[in-house]
Amino acid sequence: ADLLTALYFEVMENDPSFNMEGKGEDIFLFSNGHISPVFYSVLAHRGYFPVKELATFRQINSRVQGHPTTHEGLPGIRISSGSLGQGPSVACGMALAKRMNGDDKTIFVLTGDGEQQEGQIWEAALFAPHNKLENLVLIIDDNGQQIDGPTEEVLRLGSFEDKYKAFGWDVMNMDGN
């Protein structure tokens, strides 16, 4: 919650009136949708939609579902989550488009450590530095857990820091709590 609150209230230039194009504003992509309650709470308190709508979480016909989707029409949701690994690839495309259109704003994307086991993640990890996408910030929630158990037991990936540095990323570690 702290990380998303800091991004939406202190770091990112974002407009709760929301338009999907995001011209002239920073964009946040939520790739690890299973932690959606935190994301929805930040969006509601930032003014993207009424806070009272949070009480409808996962109810039939609610716009606040277990995994955010663009289909629900909820302001602040730019991509559907659920298919792990897509967020960074979409972020690369958006960062490249912003640069090509002369928009100097930043794309932020949040992923989970279990999600790092998806092949598409590594294509994006190679693509971004190769194309000098300096307007892209990838955040990995490295909590050591995924749906099938501890990430080290499901599929050991080793040091994310070492891998991303080897691909040409500037890497920073932080305690997000």
Placement of each model-derived feature along the sequence:
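A short, conserved beta-to-alpha structural element at the edge of catalytic cores
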Residues: 130-154
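Gly-rich Lys/Arg/Thr-decorated short loops/hinges at beta-loop-alpha junctions or inter-strand turns
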Residues: 72-76, 141-145, 162-168
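Residues at the starts of beta-strands that form the adenosine-phosphate
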Residues: 106, 134-137, 170
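Generic beta-strand/beta-sheet core signal
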Residues: 31, 110, 139-141, 174
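Short acidic-hydrophobic sequence patches enriched in Asp/Glu that either
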Residues: 49, 53, 135, 156
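Histidine- and/or cysteine-centered catalytic micro-motif in compact active-site loops
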Residues: 121, 141-143, 176
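Cofactor-binding active-site loop characterized by glycine-rich and histidine/acidic residues
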Residues: 1-130
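Conserved thiamine diphosphate
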Residues: 102-103, 152-177
